[in-house]
């Protein structure tokens, strides 16, 4: 499913928003949401 990026997931995660330090815990980023 889709999920929101989080600031708490830094290691081993994909950056999601360009101008903010948000990353995806799992899966990959599509624009500003995380897809598994």
From Swiss-Prot:
GO terms for molecular function: ion channel regulator activity; toxin activity. Disulfide bonds join 9-25, 16-29, 24-34. The keyword Magnesium does not apply. Its main location: secreted. Expressed by the venom duct. Residues 1-7 form a propeptide. Keywords: Disulfide bond, Ion channel impairing toxin, Knottin, Neurotoxin, Secreted, Toxin. It is found in: Secreted. GO terms for cellular component: extracellular region. The presence of a 'disulfide through disulfide knot' structurally defines this protein as a knottin. The cysteine framework is VI/VII (C-C-CC-C-C). Probable neurotoxin with unknown target. Possibly targets ion channels. Belongs to the conotoxin O1 superfamily. This is Conotoxin Cal6.1h.
């Amino acid at each position: 499913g889709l999920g929101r990026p989080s600031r708490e997931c830094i290691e081993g995660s994909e950056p999601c928003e360009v101008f903010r330090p948000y990353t995806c815990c799992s899966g990959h980023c599509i624009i500003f949401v995380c897809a598994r």
